[in-house]
Amino acid sequence: MYNTLNSIIYLIETQNFKLSKGKLGTNRIQNVGNALETFVKDLYARSFSSTKKQKEKNYAKTFSFMDSSNSPPDVIIRGGDALEVKKMEGLFSDVQLNSSYPKYKLRIDNPLISNECKNCEQWTEKDIVYAIGFNVKKSLRLLWLVYGDCYASDIEIYDNLKITISEGIRNIPDIKFEETNELGKVKALDPLEITNLRIRGMWTIQNPNRLFSDFINYDASTKFQIICLMRNTKYLSFDKESIKSFEGVIDPNLFVTDVSVRDPNNPQSTIDCKLITYKIF
């Protein structure tokens, strides 16, 4: 079974935290993102040491969807969670989400996801894992695996804000609008009517190192560390064999802690979560 618990076990077994080259382009920041995405896919598909041909087979077996564009998510585990891979520009700087707002869950009615994603398997809603990495040169120093329902609010919060902004733009007099999934698109802005304007949201979310600093701190003495945060209900939803295997791991650098996290939909209440950390020195 391919899931987050088994992926953490695999990382402990392999002790691997090196980034491969991934798909190389002319953009250095994009190259880092590609390498991180490859690492996360290899982690979940247990493919760190696989040949290219074997890796392709493992990917096909593990994932029902892998995206090559900018629409969310990056990956869907077959019969399991969705994965969205993001990189940290700094240990405490906001995480860039670009034009896609944060997700509590991934829903099939999200207008930003592709038809290929909607039709990859039978589903209506998926738990989503934000895999957020921080690297120094070619070495991954920190990887967060934080579930969206510990991190982001319900989709209605962001949708309502988007609708309010879009309607405000539409109320500007004497300009022409075109239907779009973005905040707005204005046409024919100049006397020749040849200039258009796309209005896009550029979303960010607070770095988990900052948001969850009450119970986790980055350990600069480590070569690598992974931090995973999920609700207790999510932890217990994994198959019994995965839970048994994970709880059978004996390693002095693996820590599993019960923590209370502010509810993203109601900060006055808390949710019971599992915090899993593993460090390589």
Language-model segments: what does each one mean?
Residues M1-P72, K87-F281:
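Nucleic-acid endonuclease domains
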Residues S69-A82:
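Short acidic loop-to-beta-strand element that houses the catalytic metal-binding Asp/Glu
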